[in-house]
Amino acid sequence: PYYDIDGHLIGVQNRNLSYQSSSINNQSSSAPRFKFPYGHTCHIYNLPVLKLLKKGEPLFITEGASDCWAMLSSGHKAVAIPSATLLKPQDLQILSTLNSQLSTVLHMYPDQDEPGERLFLDLRRLLGSPSSIVRHQLPPDYKDYSDYYLSKH
């Protein structure tokens, strides 16, 4: 489920059972891996955590809910953005406001693929300042933060 900052339900996401991934050549079916109900617009996942942020406390941005859960399990406050191309102007404004009002520095471990790197670069560009988001590098054997987290726990 997706909630707004006040905890009101604003949407849901489910796994597409028609999606099939092949480990050969990293190919996948044309069906998307995740689906949103018709008419739903994608937002930042886990917005209620923003009310818990203290001045100067970091916020971790992840690419997808499972990475967000792993980051939360690591003791960090985190949100997930499915894609920079789906990011709404009002969601981007929320992230920008955190930096200006709470001195929140955003942190990100981009997924080890082209879309993950593109999300980080797009966020850095959209936020307007390279210093508003800090990039962390995963070890080379891990595809994303949840993969890394699971290997340690």
List PLM regions with ranges:
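Intrinsic disorder
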Residues: 22, 100-103, 131-132
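Acidic beta-strand-to-loop metal/phosphate-binding motif
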Residues: 61, 104-115
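Short, small/acidic-rich helices and loops at N termini and domain boundaries
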Residues: 146-153
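Switch/connector loops and helix/strand junctions flanking conserved nucleotide-binding motifs
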Residues: 116-118, 144-145
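Active-site-adjacent alpha-helix of alpha/beta-hydrolase-fold enzymes
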Residues: 122-129
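Phosphate-handling DNA/RNA-contact segment within nucleic-acid enzymes
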Residues: 1-99, 120
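Short, acidic/turn-prone active-site loops that include or flank metal/cofactor-
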Residues: 82-87, 111-114, 138-140
